[in-house]
């Protein structure tokens, strides 16, 4: 279940957009004998590394503390918030897992002309801005959509994604339909 957050003043770490109360609640449920503040401090340190988020990602996966329960996803806390600002920009939708803003979604108006192209250009510009390093090191995936179907002839419409380590847009495309009917038996 995903909770839609409408609180305009969440207990937010403004340097990272981590939801402090949500992180602490989830962390203490997953790690009853560990201190949430220690892990938060370690994550914030790693988010400032110049490694495109690798150190933070490894901490998520390999820490002795369980930040996300990958084996039992129902043990995690899922939340989303619309238009949560970060420094000089505001993603349309932010998805949180255990208080961590790991997914950002930009939704463009269909048939808005250059909506996806303009968003791609803004994304690249933000990515290159050192002020946004922590945010890009934290967000694991970006999604962009103009709610239009994939079209080979128009490469600026459809649904796109970008991983945290690169501002390159990748497209979600429909796979070719394969005929997997076995050949008739040989006589």
Predicted regions mapped to residue ranges:
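An alpha-helical interface "stripe"
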Residues: 1-187
